[in-house]
Regions:
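Bacterial N-terminal signal peptides that target proteins for export
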Residues: 1-12
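N-terminal signal peptide c-region/cleavage motif recognized by signal peptidases
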Residues: 16, 20-21
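Terminal leader/tail segments of proteins
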Residues: 23-132, 136-170
Length: 170
């Protein structure tokens, strides 16, 4: 093979890789089936719509990958979302998580406007990635974080058992 042929072959390979690599990532992000959805209400306010997705369309505690999306029905400051997260971890007896993750969540999460979404998507190994309106915000590589975050809604001990049942489709 002469140098011109080798150069053309390498160039063609690089062009093909640039076209096909993004497809695999976008497939990975969209290859989920809905398990369930629910609306969180507090007193007379609609707070958010929550939707749980898995690859199979059914949820097994601790199994990954999972996608969990909150679509907010009101404006919220990031600090208020983190505060509510900490309160829910305290309800579950996981106060240690507040100290461990609160600052990281404050740096990741933006203020949310009505109609915007905040999503958690986990990798097969359980690594957590957050998205705001499908735009990547950042990752938390601790494999236990995702399970503890999802427990706020999916644990049998959640403060919102009716919402949990709807999310799990039971």
């Amino acid at each position: 093979m002469n140098i011109t042929t080798k150069t053309c072959a390498i160039t063609a390979t690089m062009i093909m890789a640039s076209f096909f690599t993004p497809l695999s990532f976008s497939e990975e992000q969209t290859d989920f089936k809905k398990v369930g959805e629910a609306r969180m209400e507090y007193l007379f306010w609609d707070v958010y719509d929550a939707t749980l997705y898995t690859r199979s369309g059914s949820y097994k505690q601790g199994a990954h990958p999972v996608k969990f999306t909150l679509t907010y029905l009101r404006d919220f400051a990031a600090k208020d979302i983190v505060k509510a997260t900490k309160e829910q971890w305290q309800h579950l007896g996981k106060s240690d998580l507040s100290a461990k993750y609160a600052d990281k969540l404050l740096t990741l999460w933006p203020d949310i406007k009505k109609g915007e979404s905040l999503s958690l998507q986990t990798s097969p190994s359980g690594q957590a990635t957050f998205y705001h309106n499908d735009k990547k915000l950042g990752e938390i590589s601790d494999s236990q974080f995702a399970n503890q975050f999802l427990a706020i809604w999916l644990s049998p001990n959640t403060s919102e058992p009716a919402l949990r049942k709807q999310l799990l489709g039971i």
